[in-house]
């Protein structure tokens, strides 16, 4: 098995291939036809029409990476076991180690490794941790000009302007109302940071048989 540093270097090298849509891209399993973008987006939109967060999307799969999500306000986003989403200044907090899963080009789900909960946003723009992967847990990842990423709800947006609800953290680390957040605000700017497996070895035993 390749050393963890080699695995990290490999994943890091792949990230640069997708700057136009963020830091993720798709690799279909061997022997499968790559799903078309329209097919996946269509499935997500059909789920949204079934009611807010009502459709499970556990069948969607793609590239999985582990990262910390650092906000320009100075906090790492973390998902607690009780479903609370908040910021922490602690580097390599167990609840701040997140799995990024590409479900379509430019669309990702974010799951807390330790809590096992997916990042979700409801129709009020509130962030929460979800036990199931639903349409409320799919976000549009956009690579911005300032080298930060933004994450906006794939299903919720303002009807009058079309502006989407954004994942955001306030200056005190509390989650910011996604309906009031905008792309140009630093509350919405996030930087995916690499995870050092040696800092959180308990989270890597099952994934890479790391001991």
From Swiss-Prot:
It holds the Pfam family FGF. It is found in: Secreted. GO terms for molecular function: fibroblast growth factor receptor binding; growth factor activity; receptor-receptor interaction. Keywords: Growth factor, Secreted. Gene3D superfamilies: 2.80.10.50. PROSITE patterns: HBGF_FGF (PS00247). One of its GO terms (cellular component) is extracellular region. InterPro entries: Fibroblast_GF_fam, IL1/FGF. One of its GO terms (biological process) is cell differentiation. The keyword Nucleotide-binding does not apply. Its main location: secreted. It comes from the Eukaryota. Homodimer. Interacts with FGFR2 and FGFR4. Affinity between fibroblast growth factors (FGFs) and their receptors is increased by heparan sulfate glycosaminoglycans that function as coreceptors. Neurotrophic factor that regulates central nervous development and function. Belongs to the heparin-binding growth factors family. This is Fibroblast growth factor 20. It comes from Mus musculus.
